[in-house]
Protein backbone atom coordinates (compact mmCIF):
# COMPACT_ATOMS: atom_id res chain seq x y z
CA UNK A 1 0.00 0.00 0.00
CA UNK A 2 0.86 3.66 -0.28
CA UNK A 3 -0.24 6.71 1.67
CA UNK A 4 -2.97 9.12 0.58
CA UNK A 5 -0.25 11.77 0.26
CA UNK A 6 1.64 9.61 -2.25
CA UNK A 7 -1.54 9.04 -4.27
CA UNK A 8 -2.21 12.79 -4.22
CA UNK A 9 1.32 13.52 -5.44
CA UNK A 10 0.92 11.06 -8.31
CA UNK A 11 -2.49 12.42 -9.35
CA UNK A 12 -1.37 16.05 -9.16
CA UNK A 13 2.14 15.35 -10.49
CA UNK A 14 3.78 17.07 -7.52
CA UNK A 15 6.93 16.14 -5.66
CA UNK A 16 9.28 13.27 -6.37
CA UNK A 17 7.70 9.85 -6.86
CA UNK A 18 9.66 6.87 -8.17
CA UNK A 19 8.51 5.39 -11.47
CA UNK A 20 7.69 2.10 -9.74
CA UNK A 21 5.44 3.78 -7.18
CA UNK A 22 3.80 5.89 -9.90
CA UNK A 23 2.99 2.74 -11.94
CA UNK A 24 1.67 1.01 -8.83
CA UNK A 25 -0.67 3.93 -8.05
CA UNK A 26 -1.93 4.16 -11.65
CA UNK A 27 -2.54 0.38 -11.74
CA UNK A 28 -4.57 0.58 -8.51
CA UNK A 29 -6.52 3.58 -9.85
CA UNK A 30 -7.36 1.69 -13.02
CA UNK A 31 -8.36 -1.45 -11.13
CA UNK A 32 -10.65 0.58 -8.86
CA UNK A 33 -12.00 2.75 -11.73
CA UNK A 34 -10.87 5.76 -9.72
CA UNK A 35 -11.91 9.23 -10.90
CA UNK A 36 -10.45 12.33 -9.21
CA UNK A 37 -13.04 14.42 -7.38
CA UNK A 38 -13.23 17.64 -9.37
CA UNK A 39 -15.22 19.35 -6.62
CA UNK A 40 -12.46 18.67 -4.10
CA UNK A 41 -9.87 19.97 -6.55
CA UNK A 42 -11.96 23.08 -7.18
CA UNK A 43 -12.26 23.65 -3.44
CA UNK A 44 -8.50 23.81 -3.01
CA UNK A 45 -7.90 25.84 -6.21
CA UNK A 46 -11.01 28.02 -5.76
CA UNK A 47 -12.04 27.38 -9.39
CA UNK A 48 -12.85 24.48 -11.69
CA UNK A 49 -11.35 23.65 -15.07
CA UNK A 50 -14.57 24.91 -16.62
CA UNK A 51 -15.12 27.96 -18.80
CA UNK A 52 -18.59 29.48 -18.97
CA UNK A 53 -19.71 30.35 -22.50
CA UNK A 54 -22.84 32.47 -22.77
CA UNK A 55 -24.19 33.00 -26.29
CA UNK A 56 -27.44 34.66 -27.42
CA UNK A 57 -28.44 31.99 -29.95
CA UNK A 58 -27.06 28.46 -29.90
CA UNK A 59 -28.43 27.71 -33.39
CA UNK A 60 -26.91 30.74 -35.16
CA UNK A 61 -24.21 29.61 -37.65
CA UNK A 62 -21.67 32.07 -36.23
CA UNK A 63 -22.10 30.79 -32.69
CA UNK A 64 -22.10 27.14 -33.79
CA UNK A 65 -18.55 27.71 -35.12
CA UNK A 66 -17.53 29.68 -32.02
CA UNK A 67 -18.80 26.92 -29.72
CA UNK A 68 -17.05 24.19 -31.70
CA UNK A 69 -13.71 26.01 -31.87
CA UNK A 70 -13.75 27.13 -28.22
CA UNK A 71 -14.60 23.60 -27.08
CA UNK A 72 -11.67 22.17 -29.08
CA UNK A 73 -9.23 24.79 -27.79
CA UNK A 74 -10.42 24.42 -24.20
CA UNK A 75 -10.12 20.62 -24.35
CA UNK A 76 -6.52 20.91 -25.59
CA UNK A 77 -5.73 22.87 -22.41
CA UNK A 78 -7.64 20.54 -20.08
CA UNK A 79 -10.78 22.69 -19.74
CA UNK A 80 -14.45 21.97 -20.36
CA UNK A 81 -17.18 24.35 -21.53
CA UNK A 82 -20.34 25.15 -19.62
CA UNK A 83 -22.58 26.20 -22.51
CA UNK A 84 -25.42 28.64 -21.84
CA UNK A 85 -28.00 29.81 -24.41
CA UNK A 86 -29.44 33.15 -23.23
CA UNK A 87 -31.80 33.74 -26.17
CA UNK A 88 -30.91 37.43 -25.70
CA UNK A 89 -32.90 37.60 -22.47
CA UNK A 90 -31.12 39.78 -19.88
CA UNK A 91 -32.61 37.92 -16.90
CA UNK A 92 -31.54 34.57 -18.36
CA UNK A 93 -28.01 35.92 -18.88
CA UNK A 94 -27.89 37.04 -15.25
CA UNK A 95 -29.07 33.60 -14.08
CA UNK A 96 -26.34 31.96 -16.17
CA UNK A 97 -23.71 34.34 -14.84
CA UNK A 98 -24.77 33.56 -11.28
CA UNK A 99 -24.55 29.85 -12.13
CA UNK A 100 -21.03 30.34 -13.52
CA UNK A 101 -19.97 32.13 -10.34
CA UNK A 102 -21.47 29.48 -8.04
CA UNK A 103 -19.84 26.72 -10.12
CA UNK A 104 -16.45 28.44 -9.72
CA UNK A 105 -15.68 28.70 -13.43
CA UNK A 106 -12.11 29.59 -14.38
CA UNK A 107 -13.38 32.28 -16.76
CA UNK A 108 -16.33 33.42 -18.85
CA UNK A 109 -16.67 34.05 -22.59
CA UNK A 110 -19.64 36.35 -22.89
CA UNK A 111 -21.61 37.57 -25.86
CA UNK A 112 -23.99 40.08 -24.30
CA UNK A 113 -24.99 43.65 -24.76
CA UNK A 114 -26.69 43.73 -21.36
CA UNK A 115 -24.09 42.62 -18.82
CA UNK A 116 -21.49 44.92 -17.33
CA UNK A 117 -18.30 43.00 -16.60
CA UNK A 118 -16.89 45.23 -13.84
CA UNK A 119 -18.37 43.03 -11.09
CA UNK A 120 -16.42 40.01 -12.37
CA UNK A 121 -13.09 41.81 -12.14
CA UNK A 122 -13.81 42.38 -8.45
CA UNK A 123 -14.20 38.60 -8.06
CA UNK A 124 -11.05 37.87 -10.13
CA UNK A 125 -13.04 36.01 -12.80
CA UNK A 126 -11.52 36.63 -16.24
CA UNK A 127 -14.12 37.70 -18.81
CA UNK A 128 -13.76 37.95 -22.58
CA UNK A 129 -16.49 39.81 -24.46
CA UNK A 130 -17.21 38.30 -27.84
CA UNK A 131 -18.70 40.42 -30.63
CA UNK A 132 -19.91 43.01 -28.16
CA UNK A 133 -18.16 46.07 -26.86
CA UNK A 134 -17.17 45.82 -23.23
CA UNK A 135 -16.00 47.98 -20.38
CA UNK A 136 -12.69 49.74 -20.95
CA UNK A 137 -10.50 47.09 -19.25
CA UNK A 138 -12.33 44.01 -20.53
CA UNK A 139 -10.78 41.93 -23.26
CA UNK A 140 -13.03 42.08 -26.29
CA UNK A 141 -12.86 40.08 -29.52
CA UNK A 142 -14.79 41.59 -32.40
CA UNK A 143 -15.10 41.08 -36.13
CA UNK A 144 -14.83 44.04 -38.49
CA UNK A 145 -18.31 43.46 -39.88
CA UNK A 146 -18.26 46.58 -42.06
CA UNK A 147 -15.06 45.41 -43.77
CA UNK A 148 -16.51 41.90 -44.07
CA UNK A 149 -19.52 43.27 -45.94
CA UNK A 150 -17.27 45.25 -48.26
CA UNK A 151 -15.08 42.21 -48.97
CA UNK A 152 -18.12 40.05 -49.73
CA UNK A 153 -19.53 42.57 -52.24
CA UNK A 154 -16.12 43.13 -53.87
CA UNK A 155 -15.63 39.38 -54.26
CA UNK A 156 -19.03 38.92 -55.91
CA UNK A 157 -18.41 41.82 -58.30
CA UNK A 158 -14.94 40.46 -59.19
CA UNK A 159 -16.60 37.10 -59.97
CA UNK A 160 -18.84 38.87 -62.48
CA UNK A 161 -22.04 38.96 -60.44
CA UNK A 162 -24.50 41.77 -61.16
CA UNK A 163 -27.66 43.00 -59.38
CA UNK A 164 -26.37 41.98 -55.98
CA UNK A 165 -28.77 41.38 -53.12
CA UNK A 166 -27.95 41.30 -49.41
CA UNK A 167 -29.98 39.39 -46.79
CA UNK A 168 -29.14 39.78 -43.12
CA UNK A 169 -30.10 41.04 -39.73
CA UNK A 170 -33.49 41.71 -38.24
CA UNK A 171 -35.37 44.88 -39.15
CA UNK A 172 -35.49 47.37 -36.29
CA UNK A 173 -32.90 45.54 -34.20
CA UNK A 174 -29.28 46.72 -33.95
CA UNK A 175 -27.15 43.74 -34.96
CA UNK A 176 -23.60 43.11 -36.27
CA UNK A 177 -25.20 42.12 -39.58
CA UNK A 178 -26.21 45.78 -40.00
CA UNK A 179 -22.55 46.78 -40.25
CA UNK A 180 -21.96 44.07 -42.88
CA UNK A 181 -24.95 45.41 -44.82
CA UNK A 182 -23.51 48.95 -44.64
CA UNK A 183 -20.17 47.80 -46.06
CA UNK A 184 -21.87 45.68 -48.72
CA UNK A 185 -24.14 48.54 -49.83
CA UNK A 186 -21.28 51.05 -49.93
CA UNK A 187 -19.36 48.91 -52.44
CA UNK A 188 -22.52 48.39 -54.51
CA UNK A 189 -23.19 52.14 -54.63
CA UNK A 190 -19.58 52.98 -55.53
CA UNK A 191 -19.43 50.56 -58.45
Predicted features and spans:
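Acidic (Asp/Glu)-rich catalytic clusters
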Residues: 118-124
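Central regulatory/effector-binding core of bacterial HTH transcription factors
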Residues: 72-118
